[in-house]
């Protein structure tokens, strides 16, 4: 039995960061720390999910998140099945429910779901008897990304409370931003958003963030600079004049990074648009945590699956 095995979540599912209390977040991070060490060993196996079935149901393309959940499940001993559902064939509502009912009849133990519609994962969770993990729903939430970001920050800064984190770029379309804002706020960090007004949701200040319209102001003395991918596939209108102009004002390069704290570190959830929201010199530079974020992703998802496994019958 490992040290954090007594830790549990109040619910059967992980649908979002919203609703989690600070002790649940830190409990997951503490357990993930154990899995970071396990993943660096030659033998990377635990048996928490042996004999259990995990289905990854993704209606949006994803390389890193889906492969990360697959590796996490397999390292815990689960039988993992990947189901890719073309988003054109999954209509919001009826077809999703049909899919849920069909999958439920196969008696899976854990469903990991990504869907292009906000709220779809919570809808599906109400129709099945197994644990459900939200791997990203529309522009709503991406809880495991926020958890892996928090773990990365904590390992490098030693804490989260009291830090100033600047989240920059396409906040409007970003489920990563929303989950991170809620988590960081819950753990006592100061959160700034830096974006053009066209890429900010209305009323975002209600989440307890400061909003800035220039990188120079928003990055001033920030401890962490978190860049967001410009999600051009979700943009029907003209949200930005041009990619070149966007990079000029909001792309992170060495010059803009100098406005942050001298020991500021840089993050990006990936995939990156190099030369759009971040310069390669920064992304690949000594202050970048981007590769470490990917490593932390597997550990965090193992922690989530391990914790939910203890909610399963006969666990």
UniProtKB/Swiss-Prot annotation:
The residues that the entry says bind carbamoyl phosphate are 64-65, 114, 142, 145, 270-271
Name of the top EC class for this enzyme: transferase
State a GO cellular component annotated for this protein: cytosol
Q: Which pathway is this protein engaged in?
A: Pyrimidine metabolism; UMP biosynthesis via de novo pathway; (S)-dihydroorotate from bicarbonate: step 2/3
Keyword annotations for this protein?
Pyrimidine biosynthesis, Transferase
Assigned EC number:
2.1.3.2
Provide the catalytic activity annotation: carbamoyl phosphate + L-aspartate = N-carbamoyl-L-aspartate + phosphate + H(+)
Gene3D superfamilies, alphabetized: Aspartate/ornithine carbamoyltransferase
The molecular function GO annotations come to: amino acid binding; aspartate carbamoyltransferase activity
Keyword check for Transferase, yes or no: yes
> Could you say which residues bind L-aspartate here?
92, 175, 229
A single BP term in Gene Ontology = 'de novo' pyrimidine nucleobase biosynthetic process
Q: Which residues form a coiled coil?
A: none
Function according to Swiss-Prot or TrEMBL: Catalyzes the condensation of carbamoyl phosphate and aspartate to form carbamoyl aspartate and inorganic phosphate, the committed step in the de novo pyrimidine nucleotide biosynthesis pathway.
The UniProt similarity line reads:
Belongs to the aspartate/ornithine carbamoyltransferase superfamily. ATCase family.
Q: Which NCBIfam families match?
A: asp_carb_tr, PRK00856.1
The UniProt entry, under HAMAP family, shows:
Asp_carb_tr
Q: Subunit structure, per the record?
A: Heterododecamer (2C3:3R2) of six catalytic PyrB chains organized as two trimers (C3), and six regulatory PyrI chains organized as three dimers (R2).
Return the protein name: Aspartate carbamoyltransferase catalytic subunit
Gene name tied to this protein: pyrB
